[in-house]
Amino acid sequence: MEKLSMVTSLLCAITVAVLAVAVVSGEAAVVEHTFVVHEMNATHLCNTTKIYVVNGQFPGPTVDVMEGDTVVVHVINKLPFGLTIHWHGVRQMRSCWADGAGFVTECPIPPGNEHTYRFNVTGQVGTLWWHAHVTCLRATINGAFIVRPRDGKYPFPTPAKDVPIIIGEWWELDLIELDRRMMDGNFDDNPLSATINGKLGDLSNCSRMVEESFILDVKHGESYLLRVINTALFSEYYFRVAGHTFTVVGADGNYLTPFKTDMVTVAPGEAIDVIMVADAPPAHYHMIALANQPPEPDPQIPVFTSRGLVRYAGATANNNGLPVPMPIMPNQHNTMPSYYFHANLTGLAHPERHRVPMHVDERLFVTLGLGSICRGQNTTCKRRRSPETIVVATMNNVSFAHPKTTALLERYYDGTSKGVYTEDFPIRPPRPFNYTNRDLIPPGPLEEALEPTFKATKLKRFKYNTSVEIIFQSTTLMQSDSNPMHLHGYDVFLLAQGLGNFNAKRDVRKFNYHNPQLRNTVQVPRGGWAAIRFVTDNPGMWYLHCHFEFHIIMGMATAFIVEDGPTPETSLPPPPPEFKRCGNNGLSQP
């Protein structure tokens, strides 16, 4: 945890209170927190950087609740610009107003203002997380959101302790400047290091000053529930502990069939629960978080690594004079371990589990790609070959135009959407093509032939209780990227994933209808596809986007409108009294 300056510490001592009101019983409780969001200086790698944090912490405070509790978080914005807080993976049943998606469900909280989020957590158990949902602020404004079973029982032996393992990135570049640069089409900036729970690790150093590592203290023979969360803006990560194995037991707030592995792969937005038994000889063991990279000759980025330590009780300070074991990591250019890890996970079948909808009312085939548009009002530029173009990310050739002064949910609820958005998001690409043809890697004549791309705020409307199937198809237009697609307000059945082009005649037979994973973030593999289904049982405005930050900024997003059901209990209620409408609220965005 970064240390505050003396002035900030005094300010926090006077003004910051973190309240946790819980009833130690079987009854639901109200869990209350106050988040003060502010700037803070932090020094790493011989440089002092201004970062943005909650309550002086990086990562921020953990929200720890039981299933069925009501969560109340008071956010006080001391930043010079607006922000929102998104409760990543919380289903927000009939509480879309509290989802915290900037300019989708609410306008950002203006500087110097406060906002209260209030929602219930029902039907979910496991690890979720929270983060800022405007610009690139989630790189440092984030934290774990833990939902415990109300009866205290797990479908696996109760661990001695559970520990969030929050994998992130350390940016020397100011995050607001990073956002501005990406908005202008500059995607060449990179973080300096990976982090584990805010620590860069002892592989990072400058002038022989070694960075601090995260240390996990364990006792021999005990088991530990590691809640591995990827908060990074840019990279998927491999995570390993030397001399130890894991049993994967959950993901995104849902239980999984226990799966044994010696490495966890976690994409941006994902939360993976694993059990680690401390069964090695008592000593010290290194843990590694390594960012994977696309295979060469695709565009390369620096290798980001953070090294931590598992320290057994009773082990000597110098590890008995022996070298500390290092885990053997895969080649950072090898993306196949990620594919096999995700493809081997299945949901834990139990009587109360929701069933996969076998009948499909609406089908979408969504290609994930790149395109280019003309800058400003210019409409005559020659696409990629002109300096007047800007590269954008697309879904079915549409790059999402994010609102800048209003919230989509507010306009939908008030019936004032004209001129703000349209409801014609395409359910398939303009024309089929060989989506994984390597000759499509841009720039090139084949890629240019697939233009034009449209920049627009196009949404998709669904009636209540509609069964929806979506096939996400990655394309080589994305060059080398996988795509962790996150849908707000829903858990979706991940029926299957595959490599190459999706072929219904061949691939539908691979669908897992018995025990698929329930996920809020679905990893669409590089050069492959993923199939999901869900039922629109949660009315409101729900954001769908890739969780790579540069893909969001480039426009790989849309929103789903889910209409009210036939009864008050199946309809979106009016905004709560504490909800602040957009209007003339002094909004100041970076």
Curated annotation (Swiss-Prot):
> Which segments does the entry list as coiled coil?
none
Q: What is its EC number?
A: 1.10.3.2
Residue numbers binding Cu cation 2? 88, 131, 547
What residue range is the signal peptide? 1-28
Cited InterPro entries: Cu-oxidase-like_N, Cu-oxidase_2nd, Cu-oxidase_C, Cu-oxidase_fam, Cu_oxidase_CS, Cu_oxidase_Cu_BS, Cupredoxin, CuRO_1_LCC
Its main localization is: secreted
One GO molecular-function annotation for this sequence?
hydroquinone:oxygen oxidoreductase activity
Q: Where in the cell is it found?
A: Secreted, Extracellular space, Apoplast
Binding positions for Cu cation 3 per the UniProt entry: 133, 488, 545
- Where is the segment annotated Disordered? 565-590
Domain Plastocyanin-like positions:
36-152, 161-315, 424-566
A Pfam family this protein belongs to? Cu-oxidase
Q: Where does Cu cation 1 bind?
A: 86, 486
Top EC class, one word = oxidoreductase
Q: Which GO terms describe its cellular component?
A: apoplast
Q: What is this protein called?
A: Putative laccase-19
The beginning of the lineage is:
Eukaryota, Viridiplantae, Streptophyta, Embryophyta, Tracheophyta
